[in-house]
């Protein structure tokens, strides 16, 4: 599973993108949604949570999560401490949802240039661009 979250303005309008693939790296699901006004780090956590929900809905029992947010990956892998209350609450929600995956869950950082992460980023930007165009028409 590849996820990305982004905010324009940080904080600003934000969206999440989710790309779920099977073991053969075939795309099973692509999705994006607006999540309101927030920061990039909150959007990254929200993207992961959205991906976990969709993976569960698809019947996944084990997932490998690929993110371009080194901060989120290192926090989830216990390498960085959480100092922000909002991120701590999101972190706790991720931990709670991990129990949905009896086969296990892993978190790995990938550079933004990797194809699947780049696609998740495109989904985020497409959702934000559509929202901004719609807002300008109003």
Language-model segments: residues:
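Extended, charge-rich low-complexity interaction segments
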Residues: 132-138
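RNase H catalytic domain
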Residues: 6-10, 49-123, 128-132
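A generic short-segment signal for beta-strand/edge and adjacent turn/coil regions
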Residues: 32-35, 74-77, 135
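RNase H-like nuclease fold core
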Residues: 1-42, 53-57, 61
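Loop-to-helix element that buttresses phosphate recognition and phosphoryl-transfer chemistry
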Residues: 43-47
């Amino acid at each position: 599973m590849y996820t990305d979250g982004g905010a324009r303005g940080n904080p600003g309008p934000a969206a999440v993108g989710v790309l779920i693939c099977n073991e053969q790296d075939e795309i099973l699901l692509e999705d994006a949604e607006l999540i309101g006004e927030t920061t990039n780090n909150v959007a990254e956590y929200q993207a992961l949570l959205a991906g976990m929900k969709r993976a569960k809905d698809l019947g996944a029992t084990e997932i490998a999560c690929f993110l371009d947010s080194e901060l989120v990956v290192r926090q989830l892998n216990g390498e960085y401490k959480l100092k922000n209350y909002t991120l701590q609450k999101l972190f706790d929600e991720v931990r709670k949802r991990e129990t949905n995956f009896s086969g296990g869950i892993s978190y790995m950082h990938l550079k933004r240039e990797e194809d699947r992460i780049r696609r998740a980023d495109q989904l985020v930007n497409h959702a934000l661009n559509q929202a901004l165009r719609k807002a300008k028409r109003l």
